[in-house]
Amino acid sequence: MLIIELLKAIFFGIIEGITEWLPVSSTGHLILVQEFIRLNQDKAFIEMFNIVIQLGAIIAVMLIYFERLNPFQPGKTAREVQLTWQLWLKVVIACIPSILIAVPLDNWFEAHFYFMVPIAIALIVYGIAFIWIEKQNAQQEPAVTDLARMSYKTAFFIGCFQVLSIVPGTSRSGATILGAIILGTSRTVAADFTFFLAIPTMFGYSGLKAVKFFLDGHHLDFAQVLILLVASLTAFVVSLLAIRFLTDYVKKHDFTIFGKYRIVLGSLLLIYSFFKFVF
């Protein structure tokens, strides 16, 4: 029944809206949840759905940060306009590694890593990394506390860390936040740049998935269009809350709790995979 599919779409939209911005892997969570709750749709649609619903989350970022990201915003001084264009240039530079590496390798990673065990391992590995990095940085003051002071070189290397998220379970936001902190930025700068970098990255990735879906000869029926719209709208609404939460959270806390969450979840998934394989 369509109503059941739409309820599932709402649920998946909630998962996407929360996990897209927290460093816990949205795609990984969607794949995991769909192990137990699946849309009654073909595999090609589900694979496209898992990526394209990110558009709702991206529109939320654009709405929240519209004035900050808009170089044509009335009232901005010449210096503020210049800084806005410089920010966009940093974002473009940070996209280069993904264009050169992640895009060509996407199909291979999708074929070999989009199942439970690699996701669980990635969750654990990056969970340990978050805890270790936070302990190392506990007594250190960040070198970059303002996006305006972040160099183009740093932006490029943050983009290199983003490439790591091609492995499901890694988390795009987790990889870029972790990379930015390692490179000397404050948590606030790391989170903000992660949000901004997501706009072209996820728009591009969603667009590629949609184009590939249609070029492969697939099409969308009315129910599938509705499912995508409902899931994306839900992701948009939930993302508004999740982004506000994370921006407030990083002002007072570190990311250790997310590292612990990843380790616990990854361990449970490995146990589940073991028993599923044995029995």
From Swiss-Prot:
This is Undecaprenyl-diphosphatase. It holds the Pfam family BacA. Bacitracin is thought to be involved in the inhibition of peptidoglycan synthesis by sequestering undecaprenyl diphosphate, thereby reducing the pool of lipid carrier available. Its main location: membrane. It is an enzyme of class 3 (hydrolase). GO terms for biological process: cell wall organization; peptidoglycan biosynthetic process; regulation of cell shape; response to antibiotic. Keywords: Antibiotic resistance, Cell membrane, Cell shape, Cell wall biogenesis/degradation, Hydrolase, Membrane, Peptidoglycan synthesis, Transmembrane, Transmembrane helix. It is found in: Cell membrane. InterPro entries: UppP (IPR003824). It comes from the Bacteria. Belongs to the UppP family. GO terms for cellular component: plasma membrane. It comes from Streptococcus pyogenes serotype M4 (strain MGAS10750). The chain crosses the membrane at residues 2-22, 44-64, 85-105, 113-133, 163-183, 188-208, 223-243, 255-275. It is a multi-pass membrane protein.
